[in-house]
């Protein structure tokens, strides 16, 4: 579960970086 949460955070960051 913790790993899943971490993956979600990394995914969101990558998407945000791409948008910027």
Swiss-Prot record:
GO CC entries: periplasmic flagellum
Signal peptide: none
Superkingdom assignment: Bacteria
Keywords associated with the record: Bacterial flagellum, Periplasm
Location(s) in or outside the cell: Periplasmic flagellum; Periplasm
Predominant subcellular localization, coarse grouping: periplasm
Subunit field text: The flagellum consists of an outer layer composed of repeating units of FlaA around a core that contains one or all of five antigenically related polypeptides.
Family to which this protein belongs: Belongs to the bacterial flagellin family.
Protein's job: Component of the core of the flagella.
Protein name per Swiss-Prot or TrEMBL: Flagellar filament 33 kDa core protein
Source organism: Spirochaeta aurantia
């Amino acid at each position: 579960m913790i790993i899943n949460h971490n993956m979600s955070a990394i995914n969101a960051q990558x998407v945000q970086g791409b948008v910027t």
